[in-house]
Amino acid sequence: MSILLNKTRKLNTILQKSGTEPVIFDDICNILSEVLECNVYVVSRKGKILGNNFSSGFECEKLKKEIIPTKKFPDSYNLKLLDCKETKANLKHTEFCTFYENEKCEFENKVSTIVPIIGNRERLGTLVLARFTKKFTDDDLVLAEYSATIVGLEILRSKNDEIEAEARKRAVVQLAIGTLSYSELEAVEHIFNELDGNEGLLVASKIADKVGITRSVIVNALRKFESAGVIESRSLGMKGTHIKILNDRLLEGLKKIK
């Protein structure tokens, strides 16, 4: 059995898992780093480090202490990555630092490979591989481009999940607002005008007097919103009721009906 086939099967274990749960980008980096014996970084289009893994023996303190903790590559470096429209293999590094051009690099014989991550005809990010002395072979590049495809599919899926989650949030808000009577709707508008941000303390009697409605109208409106899962409320006795917004599309939905 070929070495390439064995390595491909290791990557396939991620694909087999992705049918039931999201792929963790660090998992891809860990496996690819193991089979290719190199550093691996999955970078978003905006330069965010979605996942990474260092090969054994890699000791760049600048990268480990200044770049990785921020989970983001410098914009200048990310622009260079985005300039690569196709796979660039075995790029030799100069004597200067990859991320800080005016500083000298303490490592020699470093080679890197840059693989664009593309999905749905859109640039989604970049797969970056780096190691020392040993060049990446054609088999290595096959695995790298295959991995970039896996990552691209997962980024697209996570984007779709985000879109669906946003749509669900907005739909729940509209349903919750739709259950309110005219007086209850008037009450919640005043309630959330009183809040400082996404949570705060409400004294129902004060709002009732201010708006000219009964306290029960306010209580009913809050119960309906709590039943819909868009807010959380907790009675503090004489102090009032603490309200926390759980659905971050609620205020936006209320503004639209004004």
UniProtKB/Swiss-Prot annotation:
InterPro entries: CodY (IPR014154), GAF-like_dom_sf (IPR029016), GTP_trans_reg_CodY_C (IPR013198), Transc_reg_CodY_N (IPR010312), WH-like_DNA-bd_sf (IPR036388), WH_DNA-bd_sf (IPR036390). It holds the Pfam family CodY. GO terms for molecular function: DNA binding; DNA-binding transcription factor activity; GTP binding. It is found in: Cytoplasm. SUPFAM superfamilies: GAF domain-like (SSF55781), Winged helix' DNA-binding domain (SSF46785). It comes from the Bacteria. One of its GO terms (cellular component) is cytoplasm. Its main location: cytoplasm. Keywords: Cytoplasm, DNA-binding, Repressor, Transcription, Transcription regulation. Transmembrane segments: none annotated. Residues 1-156 are annotated as: GAF domain. GO terms for biological process: negative regulation of DNA-templated transcription. Residues 204-223 bind DNA. DNA-binding global transcriptional regulator which is involved in the adaptive response to starvation and acts by directly or indirectly controlling the expression of numerous genes in response to nutrient availability. During rapid exponential growth, CodY is highly active and represses genes whose products allow adaptation to nutrient depletion. Belongs to the CodY family. This is Global transcriptional regulator CodY. It comes from Clostridium acetobutylicum (strain ATCC 824 / DSM 792 / JCM 1419 / IAM 19013 / LMG 5710 / NBRC 13948 / NRRL B-527 / VKM B-1787 / 2291 / W). The gene is codY.
